[in-house]
């Protein structure tokens, strides 16, 4: 989903910044989009410092943030009684806390631009999925938090929304 968004936004002429834990994937994006307005950086969204550094680097490169798409996410497959608590924590750290961190540091710029904050969620944020308890919890948390943020920013001109794509091969 993220790669496709980057490619479509670049085709439309947008300035695009993206981060990933995978430097090889970022390098391939750069190679496949020479001369584009693309900024990439290795960062782990589950790490608050990485998120702050990424947003600061985006500001140095593009001066502002108009749209923030919180797309990073992982899943898990195990019934709760078999699931590792470390795995559930990792899912929450990436799927929920990564959104909180990136939004926290981008929000002042988005407010200046009256921009958009988008979260990529899942039907699991509305209906718990068996065998994916940690994933479902992360998406319920994401949607609840984004609904609260949307309400807080309702009169500010900032749009807050989330999308729930179906199963995607990535």
What is the role of each PLM region?
Residues 43-53, 85:
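The beta1-alpha1 cofactor-binding region of Rossmann-like NAD(H)/NADP(H)-dependent oxidoreductases
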Residues 103, 138:
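Active-site helix of classical SDR
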Residues 122:
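Residue(s) in the substrate-gating loop at a strand-loop-helix junction
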């Amino acid at each position: 989903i993220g790669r496709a968004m980057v490619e479509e936004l670049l085709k439309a002429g947008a300035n695009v910044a993206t981060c990933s834990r995978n430097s090889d994937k970022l390098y391939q994006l750069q190679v496949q989009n020479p001369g584009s307005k693309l900024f990439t950086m290795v960062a782990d969204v589950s790490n608050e410092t990485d998120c702050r550094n990424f947003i600061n680097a985006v500001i140095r490169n593009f001066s502002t943030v108009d749209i923030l798409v919180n797309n990073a996410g992982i899943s898990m497959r195990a019934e709760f009684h078999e699931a590792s608590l470390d795995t559930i924590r990792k899912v929450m750290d990436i799927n929920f806390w990564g959104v909180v961190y990136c939004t926290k540091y981008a929000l002042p710029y988005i407010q200046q631009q009256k921009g958009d904050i988008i979260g990529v969620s899942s039907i699991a944020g509305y209906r718990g999925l068996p065998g994916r308890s940690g994933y479902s919890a992360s998406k319920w948390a994401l949607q609840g938090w984004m609904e609260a943020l949307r309400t807080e920013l309702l009169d500010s001109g900032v749009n807050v929304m989330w999308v729930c794509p179906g199963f995607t091969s990535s």
